[in-house]
Amino acid sequence: MKSKLKPTNDWLVTDDNPKMREVCTEVKFPLSQEVLDIIDKMLAYVDESFDDNAEKYDIRPGIGIAANQLGLNQRFFYVHFTDFCQKEHRYLLINPEWIDKSLNKAYLAVGEGCLSVPKDKDGYVIRSETVKLKGFDYLTQKDVEISAHGLLAMCLQHEMDHLEGKFYYDSINMMKPYFKKDEWVSIDQKVCDQCK
């Protein structure tokens, strides 16, 4: 499933738009043309990033995008990336819901970025180390349950935050951006042995 659209940064809604702080509403089935059009844009933008074509289209590369980042405040998002263990992940989740989030914490060692945040914010984004969620995967046309750790867990939480009107930098300690506890897991290439 591939889009024929040519992605552009003009599609993106940025964090200075108050609509990005609104909680997104549930998607109704059957899917409207408006939802299908946003899905097409999601596939175009993230898949061209995945295929290393961001420079070709002069777009900021991204591994995930939520519907509200493209102007529709409804509950769906798309992720497509290869993790540190070279495993490909690709989901377009509609009406996702958390089943479980671990009390153990983790963070991406390199920090996080966002297509809707033009100027990156430095610091560790503290999240749950492991998560489990469910939703309808548009790509497989099935209800799915996903258990995740590592980069996938961080990415899913990042996109779910968007659906709640939150940004990654809301979870950075503004007084001590790089504060961490010894028991928190640093997600980087060293965690690859956990993926096997």
Swiss-Prot record:
Q: Which residues form the active site?
A: E159
Which SUPFAM superfamilies does the record cross-reference, listed alphabetically?
A: Peptide deformylase
Q: Name one GO molecular function term.
A: peptide deformylase activity
Report the InterPro entries cross-referenced here. Answer: Peptide_deformylase (IPR023635), Peptide_deformylase_sf (IPR036821)
Cofactor binding, note field:
Binds 1 Fe(2+) ion.
Entry annotated with the keyword Protein biosynthesis: yes
Give the top-level enzyme category. Answer: hydrolase
This protein's UniProt keywords: Hydrolase, Iron, Metal-binding, Protein biosynthesis
Q: Binding of Fe cation: at which residues? A: C114, H158, H162
Q: Which cofactor does it need?
A: Fe(2+)
Q: Which GO terms describe its biological process?
A: co-translational protein modification; translation
Kindly state which reaction or reactions the protein catalyses. Answer: N-terminal N-formyl-L-methionyl-[peptide] + H2O = N-terminal L-methionyl-[peptide] + formate
Entry EC no(s): 3.5.1.88
Q: Which NCBIfam families match?
A: pept_deformyl
Q: Which family, according to UniProt?
A: Belongs to the polypeptide deformylase family.
List, alphabetically, the HAMAP family matched. Pep_deformylase
Question: Main role?
Answer: Removes the formyl group from the N-terminal Met of newly synthesized proteins. Requires at least a dipeptide for an efficient rate of reaction. N-terminal L-methionine is a prerequisite for activity but the enzyme has broad specificity at other positions.
The name on file for this protein is Peptide deformylase
Q: Provide the species name.
A: Mycoplasmoides gallisepticum (strain R(low / passage 15 / clone 2))
